[in-house]
Amino acid sequence: MAVHPVLAQVTRRIQERSHATRTDYLEQVDAMAARPPQVRSMGCANVAHAFAALPGADKIRIVEEKGPNIGIVTAYNDVLSAHAPFARYPDILKDEARRHGATAQVAGGVPAMCDGVTQGMPGMELSLFSRDAIAMSTAIALTHDTFDAALMLGVCDKIVPGLLIGALHFGHLPTVFVPAGPMTSGLSNHEKAKVRELAAQGLVGRQELLAAENAAYHEQGTCTFYGTANSNQMLLEAMGLHVPGTSFINPAEAERELLTREAMRTVLSITHSKRFAPIGRVVDERCIVNAMVALLATGGSTNHLIHWVAVARAAGIIIDWDDFEQLSAVVPLLARIYPNGSADVNQFQKAGGPGYVIAQLLQAGLMHDDVLTVREDGMAAFGRIPHVENGSLLWNDAGASGDDGVLRPASAPFSPTGGLKLLKGNMGRSVIKVSAVPEDRHHLRAPAWVFDSQDELQAAFKSGALEQACQSNGHNGVVCVVRWQGPQANGMPELHKLTPPLAVLQGKGYKMALVTDGRMSGASGKVPAAIHLSPEALAGGPLAKVRSGDLMTLNASTGQLQAEVSEAEWSSRELAQMPDALKRSNGRGLGRELFAGFRRNALSAEEGACTWLLN
C-alpha cells in the first residue's frame, strides 16, 4: 500500500525542517558507534571497578571472552503499581543473557513518580520535570560506557519519555524497551468516574469514594484506562522499540516472563548480527511520524503533544503541533478506550490491541513500513499478536477485530479524524482533545472567569458560585480560565482534579470549558479543554490579558480560541502579574526548590517544555 500523501507530505516537511539538527545528531551517533569497545581501551583500574561486583564467570565472559554486556536501566519502585513487577526483571534478564554467552548489569535506577498519587497535590509540580530528571538519570547510568546495548524498564507517564530521551543521547546503543503490563480489570473506569462526580457534589462520603478507588486500582500493573502510561506503550510499539505485542499482557500472565526474556534475546540479536540498528538510527523522522499516527488513531493522551516533541528533539528531529493537526485530519480513530469509550485496555488487548491497530494503519498506508525496528522483520512484525504454544512464543497475524465496539478497521472507523485539534486565535496556540467530548460541546461561547489556581476554581464550585454564574450571565455557562500553570510558572501540573466538578456542571446542562496553560490528565475527556496554551501567562502570553467577564469563543470545529475583545483594547491591555502569594508559595517545599533551574530554563509546551535544550 502506498503511503498516504498527507503522511508523506508531513514527513518530508519534518525531514527538511530537521536537516541540520538531524545530520549533526547522526554524525555523533556514527562517531560513537565507530569507537572500539570501551572495555578494551579502559585502564585496568577502570575495568576492575566496573565489574568488581560480578560473579567470576561473568567477569570472564566480558573481559576474556569479550561477550556483550547489556546495561539495564530500571524505573523500579513499589509505590508505582505499574513498576512493582520490575523487582524481579533484572534477575530474569541476567539469566537469559548468560544463556546466550552475554552478561547484564543494572546500570542504574531512575526516579519514577505516580501522577495518580500527586494529582492536586504540591508534588504534581515536579511531575513534568521528572521526565527530564529521568533522562539525566538515564545518562548517568549509561555514562559508565561499558555497555554494548541497553534495556529500558519503564511504563508510566513521564518515565518512558524520560528513558527515551536519555537513551537517544546514547544513540549508538541498540536499545529495547521492556514493559510490565496493565493490572487486571477492577471497578470499571465509567463507574469510578460516576462515584468521583457524586463525591464532588457531596452525595457520597470519603469512605464510599475510597472504596471505589481501591476497587479500581487494586493490584500490580498500569491503570486500566487509556491515559498517558498506556499511550506510551502504544507509541513504543508503533516505533518498533518493543518486542512486538508486549505492551498489554498482564504481569501474572505466562507470556509476560517469556516476553521479558525475548527482550534480552532481541537486543542480543542486534549486537551478535552486527545489524546496524542502534536507537539513534531506529528513531528517525518516519518513526516519529508513526508514533504520532498511532497516538491519533487510538485517541491517546494529549501529554504526548509535549513529550514526543521533546523525544523527537533528542534525536535531532523538529516537530510541532501543526504536524499533529495535519495528521489528525486524515488519520481515522480506530479505537474506543476509556476515556474515549467504555472499554479498558484489557478489553482493547482482547479485541486485537496494538497489533490490530498497526496492521490496519499499515494496510491503509497510514504508517511507514520501510523503517528500522529492533526486529529484523521490521514494522510488519508489530502487526502481529503474541501467544504461547507448547511453552514457546509465537506471533499470529492480527486478523479481524475481536470487538467492533472497541476496535474498528480503517475502512469503517469510529471517526474519520484522529480527534486532536490545534486551537489558534488572540489567546495563542493550544490543543484540544475532542475524541471524548460530546459533539454538541465542540463549540461554545460564554464569559470567562479567571482563576489564579485550581484551588480557586474548586472553591468557586463548592460554594455554588460557579453554578450561580452559569445561571445568571445569560449564556448558561462559563469558560474557566486557569493561568500561572505553565512550565516556567510552576512546572505545568496536570489539572485532572478539575474534571469532576466541571463534568458535574456540564451534566446539569451548563456550557463548561477549561482554558489553561497547564496540562490535563491523559484520563480527562468529556469537558472541552483548551490546554497547553502557549506562550504561557508567566512568559507574557495573551492568557495574562484575559479578564473575568470577557466573552470567549472555543470552536474545535474551526480551530478557534478567541477572546471577543476589540483589537485596539486587546493590544493596549496590560499583562496581569502573578499574585504575590503565588510567587511566595510556588516552588517551595517538598523539594521544589531544587527545580528552580528547570522552571527558569523550560521552553514552551509546543517546544516540548524541555529544560535541557536552550534556544
Where are these regions (language model features)?
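Catalytic or ion-coupling anion/metal-binding cores of large enzyme and transporter domains
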Residues: 1-68, 74-78, 82, 91-110, ...
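Acidic/charged coordination and interface sites in well-structured regions
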Residues: 88
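N-terminal small/polar loop signature for handling phosphorylated ligands or for N-terminal nucleophile
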Residues: 107-145
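A short, small-residue-rich loop immediately preceding and capping a beta-strand
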Residues: 142-163, 174-178
